[in-house]
Amino acid sequence: MSYVIDRRLNGKNKSTVNRQRFLRRYRDHIKKAVEEAVSRRSITDMEHGEQISIPGRDIDEPVLHHGRGGKQTIVHPGNKEFTAGERIPRPSGGGGGGSGSGKASNSGEGIDDFVFQITQEEFLDFMFEDLELPNLVKRHITGADTFKTVRAGISSEGNPSRINIVRTLRSAHARRIALSGNSRAKLREAKAELERLKIEEPDNFGDIQKLEAEITRLRMRIERVPYLDTFDLKYNLLVKQPNPSSKAVMFCLMDVSGSMTQATKDIAKRFFILLYLFLKRSYDKIDVVFIRHHTSAKEVDEEEFFYSRETGGTIVSSALKMMQEVMVERYPLNEWNIYAAQASDGDNWNDDSPICRDILIKQIMPFVQYYSYVEITPREHQALWYEYESVREAFPDSFAQQQIVSAADIYPVFRELFQRRLAT
């Protein structure tokens, strides 16, 4: 009997390298399909894969052939239907690779589009590609990055000083049982048969000798299985885990006042869900502070931020004041990178808009890395937008404002706000 031991390090995903090469080759097609999927999906439905279709003409392999120049003499077979100069009509249907419309035809051929599925992980990778938090720097200077050594499981390769004896012997024992199991079963049967013959047929020397020879052969076969094989060796895997010295916090400020229609609130929630998904996926060490406001502001948890029905009037400065207070109390400026994203419909008590501008310019913007403001309205901008333009003029590198008219604008605006900047 033959035994096969799979020693491939990537046995279960043997096509992973080929798949990654394929994704790199057709990156433009996949990115376009992902952007179209984002525009038609609900933001809460982002953590799923997507079916990608690549036209058949784009998957042709390049070939070498003779150029069309020069003089050639070719003899073509004749026919009874056409004469020189006539045009051959295009088939009306059944040509292959079509959309399926039209009548059936008994002629024509083509290539269907190549359709494949990308995973949830790959979908999010393409979705958040080239995005980052702007101006992320090390605020807490402690010299070089520090690392700590942590256990990271068991490896088949390693330093002999880190060999795991228990796991090695367990693996060797399991291998010996697997490779000698059939021989051991036959050995037990032969011993039982030999005992029976010695009791019932003691004069049957021929069969007894055959069984004794078989028992000897089986024992030698079992003994030939090596006690320890290189495949059995297991080592304690130790890795260096960096201690991050860059810490970041994102303040999410959402207007839930009565002027915000349900559709506007839904767009604001979807924008922040997209932002939250981006932060949690891209950054392991980041705090998120949720602040809802109408006439008064309140710091809430994730559940209440996205699903609470509380509403009221509109005083935007209440949220900015609360953000400034939380910054001072919990996030020392010399240690934390501070970011903020604000969503509103632009409506505000008229006397409050200049207050918002002053709070931003004097108490918030000098201490934050980046502040983004999105105004969700199809109407003309109001006083708050124009006051914020003054803030943008004072802090052009760290303040950005964009308008969202419909749900289709959420993803393009999000990419515009958090597009990776080239180093200058």
Swiss-Prot record:
Residues 92-101 have a biased composition (Gly residues). Signal peptide: none annotated. Residues 57-108 are annotated as: Disordered. Coiled coil: none annotated. Pfam families: DUF444. Transmembrane segments: none annotated. NCBIfam families: PRK05325.1-2 (NF003707), PRK05325.1-3 (NF003708). Belongs to the UPF0229 family. This is UPF0229 protein Avin_46880.
